[in-house]
Structures are given as C-alpha cells and as structure tokens.
C-alpha cells in the first residue's frame, strides 16, 4: 500500500522521544469502523521478561515511519497473571451493532448495551485472546484510557492465538496454533453467559505441526459452490 512500502513501526507513548526503544511485542491487529488501527501487545520488548498486556491505537495515515500510540489501554491487572510470552495474542474490534443484546455483560448480569458505556471507544467492543488458557476476554476501552472487562469466554480449545469476527455468520472465530493441533472454535453470542461454541478441526492439507498463528475470513462473495 502507498506509504507502507517499508512498513511502519508502532511505539509506546513513553518512547515517543526514544527511537531506539525496543517497543511493543505486537501479536495481533484490528481495525475499527473509522479506520483506526489497534495492536495487541503482550510485553514491552525493553523489558522482555515481564508480561504487559496492552492495546495500542494508532492512526495508520499519520506521516512518518514511526506511529506513536494515540491511546493505550493496560489490561494486565484484569487478566490472569501469566508468564511474559503467554499473554494476549490477538485483538478484534466488533461493532456494537453486532453485540448489543447478544453479548453477555458480567457487570449488569444481562445482555450487553453500549448505552451503559458512554465513554466507549469506536462504538464497539474489543476482544482479546489469551494464549495461556484459550479464553477470550471482551472489553470496552474508554476514551480516558481506562477499560472495563465485559465478559470472559472459554473457547475450550486450550490456547488461543487468533481472532476474527465473521459478519456473515455472526460468529467469532478463535484459532489455536500447533500446540493445540490448529483447532478452532466458532462462538455465537446469545445474550447469556453460556455462549454457543462449535469446535472445528483444521482442514485437510493444513500442517498441524506448523506454528500457524494468524487467521482471517474472506467475504462470502469469495465462496465457490458453498
């Protein structure tokens, strides 16, 4: 893409004046409805031995090869304590249109309503996958830098490395790597804490011994004979 021929580097706000800083250990990426980009980072590479789960927001259209985070949300204390390299592996933004009345909100003990969160960033919910236990955690990221955990979903596949929301089937895909035979879980929100989960084995031809850690769904228009 134009201006991305050599890629762009994302940096923590604290490193804005220190271009030599190692920066975030970015593991996942998502884009909201306004085109802002969010990175999931499981540690600060300047302190590699410490787990530090954060989501960083950047404007991909900003000039320069370095993008300083416009906003940062630290999720570490709201997640299970894990080793440095077993933190969040993915982030997925889902519009409130797709989760209102469907996602269970543990704070209200009822179906989620974005109106209860007037400071919500990007009019949606951000889901992160934790490698250590395969759980998916949903958050509202507030525009003041705070965050609220909405729900905790166990994908029951052991580990989680990738997320992608299918807007056609209205399901959240959670995908594992070779440590769990590249199995996936399709999660459908039904307004209760007991979500609908369907497990999917890796398709034939996929090398389940390979360290596959990314996953994305094409639009339904790409389907052949399906």
Predicted regions span which residues?
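Sequence/structural signature of beta-propeller domains
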Residues: 1-226
């Amino acid at each position: 893409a134009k201006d991305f021929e050599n890629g762009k580097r994302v940096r923590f706000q604290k490193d804005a004046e220190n271009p030599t800083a190692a920066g975030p250990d970015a593991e996942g990426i998502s884009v909201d409805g306004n085109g802002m980009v969010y990175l999931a980072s499981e540690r600060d590479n300047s302190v590699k031995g410490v787990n530090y789960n954060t989501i960083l927001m950047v404007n991909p259209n900003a000039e320069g090869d370095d993008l300083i985070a416009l906003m940062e949300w630290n999720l570490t204390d709201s997640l299970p304590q894990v080793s440095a390299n077993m933190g969040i592996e993915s982030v997925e933004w889902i519009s409130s249109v797709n989760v209102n009345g469907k996602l269970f909100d543990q704070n209200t003990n009822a179906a989620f309503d974005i109106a209860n969160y007037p400071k919500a960033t990007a009019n949606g919910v951000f889901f992160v996958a934790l490698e250590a236990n395969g759980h998916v955690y949903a958050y509202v990221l507030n525009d003041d830098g705070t965050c609220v955990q909405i729900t905790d979903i166990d994908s029951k596949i052991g580990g989680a490395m990738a997320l992608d929301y299918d807007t056609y089937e209205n399901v959240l895909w959670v995908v594992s790597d070779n440590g769990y035979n590249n199995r996936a879980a399709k999660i459908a929100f039904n307004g209760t804490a007991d979500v609908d989960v369907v497990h999917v084995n890796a398709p034939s031809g996929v090398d389940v011994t390979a360290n596959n850690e990314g996953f994305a769904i094409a639009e339904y228009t790409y389907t052949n004979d399906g």
